[in-house]
Amino acid sequence: MAKDICAATGERIRELRWAKGWRQIDLAEHSGVHEVHISDLGRGTREPGLRTLNKIVSALGTTLSEMLRGL
């Protein structure tokens, strides 16, 4: 995944998280994804895997296609 796509994906995750009023730890608890991993994704420094993205979008109450729309 290109670095700009990683950054855009992380930004989108952050936007969706903020819309719920969640901190990184809240998303970590709801998704089962470690807080450090959430932080790395938010900064665009870690490439998200499909399994991780599915856990995150499920916790955020959205779909993968909706989250990635426009990226």
Annotated model-derived regions:
Residues 11-30, 55:
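Short basic helix-loop element that most often maps to the first helix and adjoining turn
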Residues 1-8:
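A detector for short, charged/polar N-terminal pre-domain segments
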Residues 2, 58, 68-71:
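Short, charged recognition helix plus adjacent turn
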Residues 32-47:
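Recognition helix of helix-turn-helix/homeodomain-like DNA-binding domains
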Residues 16, 41, 67-70:
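Amphipathic alpha-helical segments that mediate coupling or scaffolding at interfaces
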Residues 51-66:
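DNA major-groove recognition helix of helix-turn-helix/homeodomain DNA-binding modules
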